[in-house]
A protein has these predicted regions:
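Hydrophobic helix-and-loop "lid/oligomerization" segment in the mid-to-C-terminal part
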Residues: 1-88
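Secreted, periplasmic, or luminal enzymes acting at the cell surface/secretory milieu
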Residues: 1, 75-166
Length: 166
């Protein structure tokens, strides 16, 4: 694999070679919780960017180019979003921060012993401009509604992107 933050690509070529020989790719992406410079989420580690940290999108694009069935395992403890990943892979499993028994639970789901059902209890923002997400309002925010003719004349509320979540 690769380091989840920074520009280090060490291990990427080896990981892609292993993936090329696999029937199914389990692509683990997201953040790393903890303290210090290698962490991307945690106490005192703030970010203005909700895209995948480091070279992870590049890694995901190269894995996609292998044309293999791929299940994305998305680890994070804060909002992370990537439009390429959301629109190109066979399945995405939001793993959050799974804890001590997370690997056992994940294996049960991946091998069909458990069947996760339902929908995420949260909305995944497309970009940082959609944050914070207002869960109590039907259109996401009290400031934007279809046909609004006040100060914000763009009915989506954005001049450069859609208001639709991923």
């Amino acid at each position: 694999g690769i380091n989840c933050s920074g520009d280090n690509t060490g291990g990427m070529e080896e990981a892609l070679q292993v993936a090329a020989g696999a029937d199914v790719i389990l692509l683990t992406i997201g953040g790393k919780n903890g303290w210090g410079v290698t962490s991307t989420v945690g106490e005192g580690i703030d970010s203005t960017d909700i895209d995948l940290p480091g070279r992870q999108e590049e890694f995901a694009r190269r894995a996609y180019d292998l044309h293999k069935k791929t299940v994305v395992l998305h680890y994070d403890g804060r909002p992370l979003s990537n439009e390429f990943v959301a629109s190109h892979f066979d399945a995405i499993m939001e793993v959050w921060q799974p804890g001590e028994y997370g690997s056992q639970a994940l294996c049960k789901v991946l091998f069909g012993e458990q069947s996760p059902s339902g929908h995420l209890p949260v909305t995944v923002a497309r970009n940082v401009g959609q944050l914070p997400v207002y869960y109590g309002l039907p259109r996401g925010s009290g400031y934007v509604s279809a046909g609004h003719t006040g100060m914000i004349r763009n009915k989506n509320g954005y001049i450069n992107d859609t208001a639709e979540p991923l």
